[in-house]
From Swiss-Prot:
GO terms for biological process: negative regulation of DNA-templated transcription. Its cofactor is Zn(2+). This is Transcriptional repressor NrdR. A zinc finger (unnamed) spans 3-34. It holds the Pfam family Zn_ribbon_NrdR. It comes from the Archaea. Keywords: ATP-binding, DNA-binding, Metal-binding, Nucleotide-binding, Plasmid, Repressor, Transcription, Transcription regulation, Zinc, Zinc-finger.
Length: 162
């Protein structure tokens, strides 16, 4: 395991335990060169999951690619790293639970969209603007209207029942 601070390949494990969700092993490590401490998570390797992209090509599922897309959407939104990790794990688990070993990139995009919409509306708009390849300001307005309209409906429903 390479140190994320200095890149040295010699680290030692100083603490090991189960993660909070029980699906992975949490290891606290220390770099032998610079003494930087960091945490890693080990998880079992899933059955090989393939992603069919829009252009028809098929590639291996890349959890880091999923994480990067979500991190870009939630950047500077105050969303905790543990929340991002849980979201990535939930989406990957949902994909692994499916019978098919090949999933479409659009399915992954929809799962991310659904989760971000409930987590953070701004992150959701950021994500769908890239995922749906918005090219006109009206597309942003249409999506904002849908998000704000749903919030307004929820607000009116909660006030009418009082």
């Amino acid at each position: 395991m390479n140190c994320p601070d200095c890149g040295n390949g010699r680290t030692r494990v100083i603490d090991t335990g189960a993660s909070s969700d029980g699906a992975s092993v949490r290891r606290r490590r220390e770099c032998q060169r610079c003494s930087f401490r960091f945490t890693t998570y080990e998880r079992p390797e899933w059955k090989s999951l393939q992603v069919k992209k829009r252009d028809g090509t098929i590639e291996s599922f890349d959890q880091q690619k999923l994480r990067t897309g979500i991190e870009r959407a939630v950047e500077k939104r105050g969303v905790a790293e543990t929340t991002v990790t849980a979201l990535v794990d939930d989406i990957e688990s949902e994909l692994q639970d499916r019978e098919a070993r090949i999933v479409s990139s659009s399915l992954i995009g929809e799962l991310v969209s659904e989760n971000l919409r409930t987590l953070d509306k701004v992150a959701y708009i950021r994500f769908v603007s890239v995922y749906k390849a918005f090219s006109e300001p009206q597309e942003f307005l249409k999506e904002l209207d849908a998000v704000l309209g749903a919030e307004l409906d929820d607000f009116e429903a909660s006030n009418s029942s009082q």
